[in-house]
Amino acid sequence: MSEIIQDLSLEDVLGDRFGRYSKYIIQERALPDVRDGLKPVQRRILYAMYSSGNTHDKNFRKSAKTVGDVIGQYHPHGDSSVYEAMVRLSQDWKLRHVLIEMHGNNGSIDNDPPAAMRYTEAKLSLLAEELLRDINKETVSFIPNYDDTTLEPMVLPSRFPNLLVNGSTGISAGYATDIPPHNLAEVIQATLKYIDNPDITVNQLMKYIKGPDFPTGGIIQGIDGIKKAYESGKGRIIVRSKVEEETLRNGRKQLIITEIPYEVNKSSLVKRIDELRADKKVDGIVEVRDETDRTGLRIAIELKKDVNSESIKNYLYKNSDLQISYNFNMVAISDGRPKLMGIRQIIDSYLNHQIEVVANRTKFELDNAEKRMHIVEGLIKALSILDKVIELIRSSKNKRDAKENLIEVYEFTEEQAEAIVMLQLYRLTNTDIVALEGEHKELEALIKQLRHILDNHDALLNVIKEELNEIKKKFKSERLSLIEAEIEEIKIDKEVMVPSEEVILSMTRHGYIKRTSIRSFNASGVEDIGLKDGDSLLKHQEVNTQDTVLVFTNKGRYLFIPVHKLADIRWKELGQHVSQIVPIEEDEVVINVFNEKDFNTDAFYVFATQNGMIKKSTVPLFKTTRFNKPLIATKVKENDDLISVMRFEKDQLITVITNKGMSLTYNTSELSDTGLRAAGVKSINLKAEDFVVVTEGVSENDTILMATQRGSLKRISFKILQVAKRAQRGITLLKELKKNPHRIVAAHVVTGEHSQYTLYSKSNEEHGLINDIHKSEQYTNGSFIVDTDDFGEVIDMYIS
């Protein structure tokens, strides 16, 4: 044998071979044929079982025998892949109508593996035989198998639209398919309507075929997605579990799941829900139990008392496979190539296949009827001259001589002569003559009917309709999946996601924030808070994990931080810097922090800047869903800083204190509500080179404590403050000195909650009791507390 050596580039060889491989796996492995809805391995399994007599009316046979037949005759691949395909055809949670009945463990909805093929037994289901019916009547083309030892069908007759009824899923080179299963009665009804009116629209078809009908049931949402898929082959729907509510004896409620989305692994779903419970991602679930038994699927989710079951349901829909999105991608092999097809194209392709199948069957039956008619006519003629025929046969040498004599003497045909010589003597009675004449009449009618079907297209379509109606009547079942027109928007209450727990929120002046358990706080005490050198506590208060923290900075921005997102850190340990939660600028400083339980309130914030601007904005404006970056609270002009943020439930007095000792007190009712991006209005009429040190709310029972740079503290009562109008100069609180005058560096409104003060220089701090500071008159500079020569110039004061 001579060798042919070709000199080819690697790129050409790889491209050519991969092209061949891709074509093979597209056409011969992963995608179904639009006509019978089967992939090649599925078709070969069903045909092997049918041809070996492993039908529904016979006993079950070992699966291993079928797998062996398929591998040996039609599908030269691994036994495991053939067995897996065979098992899938028997799983009633994968197929809307199973094509194989199987005894033994054929897997489960938990994705458990089936028993080995040597243990399970199988046979064709009754419906599967409708796919194969009339296959022996030359209805479809056969091709040689892989080793040319036998023939296999290119496609099955498929007497019902299996592609739509059982759907298909698969991935090949460059193509994937996801066709959902449908209700058999609905699909057949839609096909019948298409036969009556080939111009029927998708909208009209959807009166009969409502949408997918999954074997696992569930609730389908989104008619628009179904319509889009039926029109174009692509679309998206939502499939959610069927969930009911039960009340237990102890008063608790539990959610009972009886149907889950198609192709969702039940055990994985149960595990996921239990993980959400264990990780405290959802609050209100006591226990998750899989109570599935032979009576049906059942998952029980026991809830705590007084929880909102609807919110928990919504959370699970969003965060587990209790609800999934299903994407139609209706790709099938049509005319030898993959095509994305809408429902009209699929039905049209199926109908054309049925026209061909019924026409071929009719031709086959007509041919047989005509052949039998010819024989019957010969037998009737022979019986009419029976004595002569018998005498001729007796005088013949042998069977061959008898046949030749019959043909020559009485002009019988070869086929008629063969039938006559094979005729048994007991058939030569008057009864058989009558029977033959009756058969002749029946054959005449049959041939006329068959010719009418072949000559008349409408008659052929009527045959298809009658046979489809028979299958519909025999195999119809109620719809399992409920269809809802709209996709429901899922709203989740925060209470469901976050366990309710009282904690201590703390913020330091240097911007370190944390939440601490009440237990850790009580075990330590306020003084033992973890701090960096030079840092001090700005604020601490009891909050709930379901609250939201608003952190305000000198740049007029705020950080929106849900309390549950704060790190849970022990009281004695250092907190987390806010910049690690939300990025802020290097020179940005935290000036105050508040918690909000509900933004639906009439409360408001007041913002005051160093250069004397002020603004009021209502609390609801600060609600947001963006946590990842700072947001605008107020517009701060260049060379200005936000220095005070206050929160009030209703209008009240505020006092403004400046560096040069001026004070203006007025009511917040003078401020109009403004948006977050507004800069506000003038708060106080500042002197040259003066600036605001603090703006705080004040009431009649309060006192004002002020610290000067020279180490003096001055405390005054509310009555010294004179209530005036906004934007005035205000009153003087210090005695002006010509040399080294006192300047206020810090001031606070002292309420009944405050008892201590702390003075700060760059390197020192001094603590004392507020009540030790006697109240002063208006025009004094207070009392010296520290010697600045030793302590350093005072730069700040903190009260607690």
UniProtKB/Swiss-Prot annotation:
InterPro entries: GyrA/parC_rep, Gyrase/topoIV_suA_C, Topo_IIA-like_dom_sf, Topo_IIA_A/C_ab, Topo_IIA_A_a_sf, Topo_IIA_dom_A, TopoIV_A_Gpos, Type_II_DNA_Topoisomerases. Transmembrane segments: none annotated. PROSITE patterns: TOPO_IIA. Its EC number is 5.6.2.2. Topoisomerase IV is essential for chromosome segregation. It relaxes supercoiled DNA. Performs the decatenation events required during the replication of a circular DNA molecule. It is found in: Cell membrane. Heterotetramer composed of ParC and ParE. One of its GO terms (biological process) is DNA topological change. One of its GO terms (molecular function) is DNA negative supercoiling activity. It catalyses: ATP-dependent breakage, passage and rejoining of double-stranded DNA. Belongs to the type II topoisomerase GyrA/ParC subunit family. ParC type 2 subfamily. Residues 31-495 form the Topo IIA-type catalytic domain. Keywords: Cell membrane, DNA-binding, Isomerase, Membrane, Topoisomerase. The active site is at 119 (o-(5'-phospho-dna)-tyrosine intermediate). It comes from the Bacteria. One of its GO terms (cellular component) is extrinsic component of plasma membrane. HAMAP family: ParC_type2. It is a peripheral membrane protein. This is DNA topoisomerase 4 subunit A.
